[in-house]
């Protein structure tokens, strides 16, 4: 009996074990899938953690600022994004001077801040032939709320596909239309709390900063680094430091410099004002005052970011370059900007369409109609401005001044009390001296100069220049106003004179003869080339040359000029157009797929040259074909006007092909334009 029970028990256990094994075998695929999924998730998490950039904290006298590490060709760069340098310009601060802002005790600077409100009508101020790649690194989404923003739903730039391009001085007219806005034109991303800056620091290891993995020991790598502060362009109408074009990591890493790119107010929110000669509270020209405050912030704080406050180079493109030239001339900025020694100006200067005071003054002529257009009533400027402070920023950013007009600097404020020519006469080296000589032989000083033996006050080193095809966008914009199926002759003699009149040209026919000796049988391509050349000279090249002459002959400043002519592979034009020179400075060919090896080499050479100018004030030697030798980059003088052409074939000394045209333009255009 016992034996039988034992046998039965064995059979029972055997049957049960077999069933269990069978069940386990059936569950095996599910178990395998679960294990695989868990392993995959663990791998992804581990990979993400490995890729996650460590936080990098800088301690200032009032704050701990957290940035992040990025790698650029094996070089560590610390990136600080969206650091506020002024209070929000909303509410009572609208139309007023920027107010200094203290940093919070802890600040996360790992995400871009919002762009300033700006005009958005499908017009974007860049070169449509030169699309800018979006950056997966530079994103605008808010990061833990430490940087106040008007909207927490902003999308990263990488989520917005847009072909963008930029113009410069006075040029909502010189724009190309696109189907979608640039990310910084998106009203949902914009804010009046937009006065912030981005900083890139190469291989930062000084004692006031540490990574999250540090042992806590202070490290010091020696002297502070030179600083390049770069102001973006956009014709004073568009643009932002969130444009990937101004991503400073490559310039910082390869140049060994600290790079700072600030925001500033633009459009109506920057240039609507009261009669500012009696009311300092709403002074106008707020874009310039924002830039001034950004420079003050840099001088105060940049030492904490390994930057040398005694070696700051200020650079700009387009309206950013125009701003720098105006700062140089402003009597109010002398204490701040004149303390800086080196400047780099791309494609613009203080002279240009906006410098002509023949247009009505904003504060006296346009404040009332603008206010009426948005429902504000009242007779006095203070009352109208109080009302305008209650209007949405979106509405104000959309305001129009009329055909051929845009919001831009005016010359009636405490900061800019006179035209550029008038301001030059107020700078000591340009005043009449004991000998009775004047640096200007004519009313505006455009015709000739006398060398003065004076003790110079303005002692700066300036690198300034243009691209080979400055007028491409201006012609493209003009071409959009011309009806199709129209003859070349009609364009030249009916439509173009009206366009030139917007820029102060008094004798369009005479000016056309300078660029077109014979229009008989002229092809459309021939006309486009000539008119593009004309507009480029009028708006950009000649104003830049004029400032170079003023600075080099009116002071003992060292001025060097350049022309960049390399055709970029991503461009539809035959030679370099506006802002493609900025691409070389910021290393775009090094990060954009499809760039040619020649473009990459050229970008490295430009970064090296610009960085050495920032560090030492020195420039590379150039090739002189006339002597067959290499010589020092010559300074710019009125009798020599040497220009260095920069392209893939090197840095070459070339004759200034614009000189003759610029002198003729002086006689045919409004006095303060060229």
Kindly give the residue locations of the regions a language model identified:
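Active-site-proximal substrate-binding core of FAD-dependent oxidoreductases
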Residues: 626-644
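Catalytic active-site module of serine/aspartate enzymes centered on a nucleophile-bearing elbow/loop
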Residues: 614
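Bulky hydrophobic/aromatic "packing anchor" residues in well-ordered structure
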Residues: 85, 388, 582-584, 644
């Amino acid at each position: 009996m016992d034996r039988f029970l034992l046998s039965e028990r064995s059979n029972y256990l055997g049957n049960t074990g077999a069933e269990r094994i069978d069940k386990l075998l059936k569950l095996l695929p599910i178990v395998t899938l679960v294990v695989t999924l868990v392993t995959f998730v663990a791998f992804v998490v581990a990979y993400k953690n490995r890729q996650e950039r460590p936080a990098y904290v800088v301690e200032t006298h009032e704050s701990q600022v957290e940035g992040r590490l990025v790698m650029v060709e094996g070089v560590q760069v610390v990136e600080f994004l969206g650091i506020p340098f002024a209070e929000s310009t909303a509410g009572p601060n609208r139309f007023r001077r920027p107010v200094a802002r203290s940093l919070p005790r802890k600040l996360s600077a790992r995400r871009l801040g919002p762009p300033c409100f700006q005009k958005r009508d499908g017009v974007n101020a860049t070169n449509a032939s030169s699309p800018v790649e979006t950056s997966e690194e530079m994103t605008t989404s808010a990061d833990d709320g430490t940087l106040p923003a008007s909207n927490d739903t902003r999308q990263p730039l990488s989520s917005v596909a847009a072909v963008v391009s930029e113009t410069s001085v006075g040029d909502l007219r010189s724009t190309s239309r696109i189907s979608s806005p640039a990310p910084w034109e998106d009203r949902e991303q914009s804010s009046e709390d937009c006065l912030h800056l981005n900083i890139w620091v190469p291989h930062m290891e000084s004692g006031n900063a540490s990574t999250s993995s540090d042992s806590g020991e202070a490290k010091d790598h020696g002297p502070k680094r030179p600083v390049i502060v770069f102001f973006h362009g956009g014709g004073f109408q568009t643009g932002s430091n969130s444009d990937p074009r101004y991503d400073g990591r490559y310039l910082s890493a390869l140049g060994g410099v600290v790079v700072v790119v600030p925001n500033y107010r633009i459009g109506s929110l920057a240039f609507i004002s009261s009669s500012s000669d009696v009311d300092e509270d709403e002074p106008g020209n707020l874009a310039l005052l924002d830039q001034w405050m950004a420079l003050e912030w840099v001088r105060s704080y940049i030492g904490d970011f390994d930057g040398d406050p005694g070696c700051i180079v200020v650079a700009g493109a387009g309206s950013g370059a125009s701003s720098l030239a105006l700062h140089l001339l402003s009597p109010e900025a002398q204490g701040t900007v004149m303390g800086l020694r080196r400047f780099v100006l791309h494609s613009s200067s203080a002279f240009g369409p906006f410098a002509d005071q023949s247009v009505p003054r904003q504060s006296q002529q346009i404040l009332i109609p603008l206010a009426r257009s948005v429902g504000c009533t009242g007779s006095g400027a203070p009352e109208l401005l109080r009302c305008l402070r209650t209007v949405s920023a979106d509405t104000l950013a959309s305001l129009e001044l009329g055909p051929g007009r845009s919001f831009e600097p005016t010359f009636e404020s405490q900061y800019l009390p006179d035209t550029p020519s008038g301001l030059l006469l107020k700078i000591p080296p340009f005043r009449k001296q004991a000998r009775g000589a004047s640096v200007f032989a004519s009313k505006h000083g455009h015709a000739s100069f006398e060398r003065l033996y004076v003790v110079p006050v303005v002692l700066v080193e300036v690198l300034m220049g243009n691209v080979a095809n400055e007028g491409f966008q201006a012609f493209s914009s003009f071409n959009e106003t011309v009806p199709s199926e129209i003859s070349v002759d009609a364009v030249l003699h009916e439509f173009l004179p009206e366009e030139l009149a917007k820029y102060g040209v008094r004798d369009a026919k005479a000016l056309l003869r300078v660029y077109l000796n014979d229009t008989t049988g002229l092809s459309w391509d021939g006309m486009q080339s000539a008119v593009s050349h004309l507009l480029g000279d009028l708006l950009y090249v000649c104003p830049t040359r004029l400032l170079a002459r003023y600075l080099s002959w009116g002071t003992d400043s060292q001025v060097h000029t350049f022309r960049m002519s390399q055709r970029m592979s991503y461009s539809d034009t035959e030679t370099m157009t506006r802002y493609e020179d900025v691409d070389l400075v910021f290393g775009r060919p090094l990060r954009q797929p499809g760039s040619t090896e020649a473009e990459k080499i050229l970008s490295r050479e430009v970064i090296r040259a610009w960085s050495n100018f920032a560090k030492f004030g020195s420039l590379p030697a150039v090739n002189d074909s006339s002597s067959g030798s290499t010589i020092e980059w010559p300074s710019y003088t009125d009798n020599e006007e040497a220009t260095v052409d920069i392209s893939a074939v090197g840095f070459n000394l070339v004759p200034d092909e614009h000189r003759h045209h610029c002198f003729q333009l002086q006689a045919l255009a409004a006095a303060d334009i060229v």
